Curated annotation (Swiss-Prot):
It comes from the Eukaryota. InterPro entries: F-box-like_dom_sf, F-box/kelch-repeat_ARATH, F-box_dom, Kelch-typ_b-propeller, Kelch_1. Residues 9-55 form the F-box domain. SUPFAM superfamilies: F-box domain, Kelch motif. CDD domains: F-box_AtAFR-like. Kelch repeats lie at residues 151-197, 198-248, 250-296. The keyword RNA-binding does not apply. Keywords: Kelch repeat, Repeat. This is Putative F-box/kelch-repeat protein At4g11770.
C-alpha cells in the first residue's frame, strides 16, 4: 500500500508453448538450469525433447555441457550436477543469495565462510554446478560412466547389493534414466572407453576371467559383442587404466597392450613409449594429443619424440591436487576442463570447495603448446565426507 493506493502484481501476458520454445531454443543451454526455476511450466519446457528439435531447426549448434556426480555418504546413490552460468542481474554491492534464483546447491560457498576466507573464495563464481532433478532414479549403484552424444552410460556395479550386468543411460536433454541392453557378464568396476562410437568395457581387477575380459556395445545396433582377449604372454595380472589414443585402445597395468580395432589385433607395448604415465594421473585426449595432470602440473605427450612436455602459459593456475581421487580432467569441446577439490581454510570447517577451470589450447610449434585460462571458479561447496565420482563432458 502506497499513498492509499493498493499495489497489484504485474500482469504477465500468457505466451503459448510454441513461442516460448522458440525463445528458449535461442538461449545457451548453460542457462537452462536457472530458467527451470522460473516455474513448473518452464521446467517442463526446458526438459522437453521438442525444445531440442526446435534448436536444430533454428540452426543452433550442439553445445558441450559438463556433468559431475558425487556421493555424499557411504552406500548412497550418486547425485548428478551440471555446469550452469549465473545470470546477469542488476548490479548490487551485496548479492542476495536468498533470492529465488538460487537454491542451497547453487551457492559456491556459505556466506559466513566467505567473509573469513581468502580473496579467491570471496568472489561469487560466475559458473556453478547445480543439482539436476531427474524424473526417475537409476537403480544401479555404479561407479563407471562414459558418454556418447547426449547420453551418459552407467556401467558396472550393484543393484540391491547384487553384482549386475544391467546398463543404464541418462538422457541429458530430459534428464531421464533409461535402460540399455545388459552386458554379457556382470562387472564390478570396469574401465569404460569410447572408440569409433562404440563402448569398450574392460574388467581390470586381478583374478578376472580373462576369457570375458572385454566386450563392446554398439549404440546403433543395440548389441554387445565379445572381443578376444590378449594372449597370456601379453596380458599381466591387472589393468589399471584404459586410454583411447590414435584410434587404438591402450590398456596399462603391470604389462601394457594396445588393441587395434581395424585389424582386430593385440600388440604388446614396452615401457619405452612413456605413454603408460597416464596410469598415475587424470588425463584426456584432445586433437590426438594426450594431456594429464602430473605432480600438480599439466603436461602433454609429444608422440614424435615419446616425451612428456609441460603445458606452458598456466603460471596463474591455482595449485592442483596430485591425488587421482581429488582431480578430474576432460575434453570440453577442444578445450581442457579440470575439476578438483580444495579444503575450506577455516578452522573447524567441515566443508570443501570444488573448483573448475576451462583452458583453451594453442599449438605454437611442433613441440610447444600453450594454455590460456578462460575462467577459474569455485563451482560448488560440499561436506568433506563427499566423494568425487565422475566428471564428464556431454554434447547436447
Amino acid at each position: 500500500m502506497m499513498n492509499g493506493i493498493k499495489s497489484s502484481p504485474c500482469n504477465m501476458p500468457y505466451l503459448p508453448d510454441d513461442l516460448l520454445l522458440n525463445i528458449l531454443g535461442r538461449v545457451s543451454r548453460l542457462y537452462y538450469p536457472i530458467l527451470s526455476l522460473v516455474s513448473k511450466r518452464f521446467r517442463s519446457l526446458v526438459g522437453s525433447l521438442e525444445l531440442y528439435k526446435i534448436r536444430t531447426l533454428l540452426g543452433r549448434r550442439t553445445e558441450n555441457c559438463l556433468y559431475l556426480s558425487l556421493r555424499f555418504s557411504y552406500g548412497s546413490n550418486p547425485r548428478w550436477f551440471t555446469l550452469c552460468r549465473r545470470p546477469t542481474r542488476t548490479p548490487s554491492p551485496e548479492p542476495n543469495l536468498k533470492s529465488r534464483w538460487f537454491t542451497s546447491c547453487f551457492r559456491p560457498i556459505l556466506t559466513n565462510l566467505t567473509r573469513a576466507t581468502s580473496k579467491e573464495e570471496k568472489k561469487l563464481s560466475e559458473n556453478l554446478m547445480v543439482s539436476i532433478p531427474t524424473s526417475n532414479d537409476c537403480p544401479l549403484s555404479g561407479l563407471t560412466c562414459n558418454t556418447i552424444g547426449s547420453y551418459i552410460y552407467m556401467i558396472g556395479g550393484y543393484i540391491n547389493g547384487v553384482l549386475s550386468s544391467r546398463v543404464f543411460f541418462l538422457d541429458c536433454r530430459s534428464h531421464t534414466w533409461h535402460e540399455a541392453p545388459s552386458m554379457q557378464v556382470a562387472r564390478k568396476s570396469p574401465l569404460v572407453n569410447v572408440l569409433d562410437g562404440k563402448i569398450y568395457v574392460v574388467e581390470g581387477w586381478r583374478g578376472s576371467d580373462y576369457s570375458n575380459l572385454i566386450e563392446i556395445f554398439d549404440p546403433k545396433t543395440q548389441k554387445w559383442e565379445h572381443v578376444p582377449s590378449p594372449s597370456a604372454e601379453m596380458r599381466g595380472r591387472y589393468i589399471s587404466k584404459g586410454l583411447v589414443y590414435e584410434e587404438k585402445l591402450y590398456l596399462f597395468g603391470d604389462k601394457n597392450v594396445v588393441y587395434k580395432p581395424k585389424e582386430s589385433r593385440w600388440d604388446a607395448l614396452g615401457f619405452d613409449m612413456n605413454l603408460w604415465l597416464v596410469s598415475y594421473g587424470s588425463s584426456c585426449v584432445i586433437d590426438n594429443v594426450c594431456y594429464m595432470v602430473f605432480y600438480k602440473r599439466l603436461i602433454w605427450y609429444d608422440s614424435e619424440v615419446r616425451y612428456w612436455r609441460v603445458l606452458k602459459g598456466l603460471e596463474k593456475l591455482p595449485k592442483l591436487r596430485h591425488r587421482r581421487s581429488c582431480i578430474r580432467m576432460v575434453d570440453y569441446g577442444g578445450k581442457i576442463a579440470i575439476l578438483w577439490e580444495k579444503k575450506v581454510r577455516v578452522v573447524g570447517s567441515d566443508k570443501k570447495m570444488i573448483w573448475c577451470t576451462e583452458i583453451a589450447l594453442e599449438r605454437r610449434s611442433a613441440h610447444k603448446i600453450y594454455g590460456k585460462i578462460e575462467w577459474c571458479d569455485v563451482v560448488l561447496t560440499v561436506p568433506k565426507s563427499c566423494s568425487l565420482l565422475e566428471f564428464i563432458a556431454v554434447t547436447i
